[in-house]
């Protein structure tokens, strides 16, 4: 069985958790990237995507350099933007068929999960999910979720 970890990270929070997972699981890693990068100005991105506007935004993502058919398990990581998945992950889920894959999503947020997992489950068969809550100051890179919860999530994938 091969495992692929696919994630998008804007502020670095999701990458932090992806790296933690990668350190414990033998898996290939793909960082999803929009063709046209988002602004480096955090407030500008918040203003553009607030009020669930991200649901309506279609963006193009860079092509994956892997063949998804080669993987049995897919770990998906995304920040939560306005109670939902990011436009980057939404495009990935719309573009790639994950039928027959065991999918393990994790999210990062400051406490506002919303409908994120429900939206992911609308695209694929979720085996186990993990919500990693960070402090409200995204620059701190400090999560509040227990290491034990993260460990249990990782063990469920093994």
Annotate each language-model stretch with its function.
Residues 76-77, 105:
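Redox-cofactor binding/interface segments in oxidoreductases and associated redox assembly factors
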Residues 1-76, 83-85, 90, 94, ...:
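N-terminal beta1-alpha1-beta2 submodule of the flavodoxin-like/Rossmannoid cofactor-binding fold
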Residues 128-158:
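Glycine-rich phosphate/pyrophosphate-binding loop and the adjoining helix
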Residues 26-28, 125-128:
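Conserved beta-strand segments of alpha/beta enzyme cores
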Residues 116-124:
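Short, aromatic/basic amphipathic alpha-helical patches
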Residues 68, 94-101, 123-125:
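Short, conserved loop/helix-junction motifs that constitute active-site signature segments
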Residues 79-82, 109:
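Short glycine-rich anion-binding loops that position phosphate/pyrophosphate groups of nucleotides
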Residues 33-36, 104-110, 130-137:
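A short, structured active-site edge motif that brings together acidic residues
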């Amino acid at each position: 069985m091969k495992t692929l970890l696919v994630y998008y990270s804007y502020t670095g929070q999701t990458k932090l958790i992806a790296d933690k997972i990668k350190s414990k699981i033998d898996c290939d890693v793909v960082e999803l990237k929009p063709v046209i990068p988002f602004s480096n100005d955090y407030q500008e991105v918040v203003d553009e995507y607030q009020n669930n506007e991200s649901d309506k935004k279609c963006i193009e993502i860079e092509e994956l350099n892997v063949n998804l058919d080669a993987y049995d398990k897919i770990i998906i990581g995304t920040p939560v933007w306005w109670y939902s998945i990011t436009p980057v992950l939404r495009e990935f889920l719309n573009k790639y068929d994950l039928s027959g894959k065991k999918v393990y999503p994790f999210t990062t947020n400051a406490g506002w999960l919303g409908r994120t997992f429900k939206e992911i489950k609308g695209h694929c068969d979720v085996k186990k999910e993990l919500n990693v809550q960070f402090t409200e100051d995204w620059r701190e890179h400090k999560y509040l979720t227990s290491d034990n919860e993260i460990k249990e999530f990782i063990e469920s994938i093994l």
